[in-house]
């Protein structure tokens, strides 16, 4: 919730001044391998991706609002690994408007040796500076 306090912030801010910022992350981890109770676990298609998309949209709105603490809490619930970078991006660029363009997922059942469903979803998003 304090992006300006992240390690190496000054260096990142200097580099980002005249740069396009591109990041990767999975904003939604779901399923048995991520601690979801089996009776609540959704297959990625079609219901899981709808849930992931809704969750990612909530995250976008929190970043737009500059609600760093709220976004932090949202990332805990969504099991997002995008916590620091999204907040840092907003902090560096100021007011932004975000759009979820597409969403994809990776099946992680073999990776974690867990039963299905175990998967992670990431959104293809763009953020534009509000002028």
Label each PLM-derived region with a short phrase.
Residues 1-18, 31-131:
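Flexible, D/E/H-enriched segments
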Residues 20-22:
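Hydrophobic "anchor" residues on beta-strands that sit immediately upstream
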Residues 24-28:
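Catalytic metal-binding/acid-base residues of hydrolase active sites
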């Amino acid at each position: 919730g304090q992006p300006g306090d992240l390690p190496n912030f000054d260096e990142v801010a200097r580099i980002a001044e005249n740069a396009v910022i591109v990041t990767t992350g999975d904003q939604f981890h779901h399923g048995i391998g991520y601690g979801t109770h089996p009776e609540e676990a959704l297959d990625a298609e079609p219901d899981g991706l709808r849930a992931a998309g809704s969750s990612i949209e909530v995250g976008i709105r929190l970043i737009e609002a500059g609600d760093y603490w709220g976004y932090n809490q949202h990332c805990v619930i969504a099991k997002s690994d995008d916590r620091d970078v999204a907040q840092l991006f907003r902090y560096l660029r100021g007011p932004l408007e975000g759009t979820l363009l597409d969403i994809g997922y990776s099946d992680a059942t073999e990776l974690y040796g867990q039963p299905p469903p175990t998967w992670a979803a990431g959104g293809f998003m763009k953020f534009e500076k509000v002028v």
